[in-house]
């Protein structure tokens, strides 16, 4: 049975950058990795409501200063009135960190939300949770991406589609999505939709362009 590589991990160092940037010695590594995992797990729980597309974690050489860059399609909702939402987020994230860590959060706006695989996956999940037919939800996301002149997009939905007794997977692709071409700038994201029939899995592949070396 054929096994598929992760589209982003496959391209690290070529078209993709690491989402965590820090260095640690042998004794520190496991603890810092756990901190990153706790931060990402918490932010994932609020990502759908706040349209969070990406989270990047940067640390200084001593690993006592953390810079958290959050990319979102709706920065106003995340920041809140007079920064109240951002202050709440800062306090909640600090709960997962030792007392000696200094945390800074930067909220960055995603300029083209229809060119982000994570936000498109959130859109499909939101539609499915509103009990809209899965093909209609996929088509709407495809059309929004095509208006941004992407080279290709593929969306797959898996589970008890439209309440069917037997779970299955269906996908629709428009244009090219060359997963084996390393120079292809592929964006990839997954999301879950909680429906009355169970959980539906959503995958989005977005082929933006080919990055050619000079």
UniProtKB/Swiss-Prot annotation:
This is Small ribosomal subunit protein uS3c. HAMAP family: Ribosomal_uS3_B. Keywords: Chloroplast, Plastid, Ribonucleoprotein, Ribosomal protein, RNA-binding, rRNA-binding. It holds the Pfam family Ribosomal_S3_C. PANTHER family: 30S/40S RIBOSOMAL PROTEIN S3, SMALL RIBOSOMAL SUBUNIT PROTEIN US3C. InterPro entries: KH_dom-like_a/b (IPR015946), KH_dom_type_2 (IPR004044), KH_sf_prok-type (IPR009019), Ribosomal_S3_C_sf (IPR036419), Ribosomal_uS3_bac-typ (IPR005704), Ribosomal_uS3_C (IPR001351), Ribosomal_uS3_CS (IPR018280). GO terms for molecular function: rRNA binding; structural constituent of ribosome. One of its GO terms (biological process) is translation. The gene is rps3. Its main location: plastid. Part of the 30S ribosomal subunit. Belongs to the universal ribosomal protein uS3 family. Gene3D superfamilies: 3.30.300.20, Ribosomal protein S3, C-terminal domain. One of its GO terms (cellular component) is chloroplast. It comes from the Eukaryota.
């Amino acid at each position: 049975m054929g096994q598929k590589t992760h589209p982003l991990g496959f391209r690290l160092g070529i078209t993709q950058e690491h989402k965590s940037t820090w260095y640690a010695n042998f004794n520190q590594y496991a603890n810092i990795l756990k901190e990153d995992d706790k931060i990402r797990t918490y932010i994932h729980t609020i990502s759908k409501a706040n349209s969070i597309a990406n989270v990047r974690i940067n640390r200084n050489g001593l690993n006592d200063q953390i810079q958290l860059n959050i990319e979102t399609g709706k920065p106003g909702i995340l920041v809140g009135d007079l920064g109240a939402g951002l202050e709440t987020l800062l306090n909640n994230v600090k709960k997962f960190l030792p007392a000696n860590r200094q945390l800074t959060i930067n909220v960055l706006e995603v300029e083209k939300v229809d060119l982000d695989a994570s936000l498109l996956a959130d859109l499909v999940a939101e539609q499915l949770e509103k009990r809209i037919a899965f093909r209609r939800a996929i088509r709407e996301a495809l059309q929004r991406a095509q208006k941004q002149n992407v080279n290709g997009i593929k969306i797959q939905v898996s589970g008890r589609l439209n309440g069917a007794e037997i779970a299955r997977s269906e996908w629709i692709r428009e244009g090219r999505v060359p997963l084996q071409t390393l120079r292809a700038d592929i964006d990839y994201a997954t999301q879950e939709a909680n429906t009355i029939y169970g959980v539906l899995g959503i995958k989005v592949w977005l082929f933006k362009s080919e990055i050619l070396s000079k």
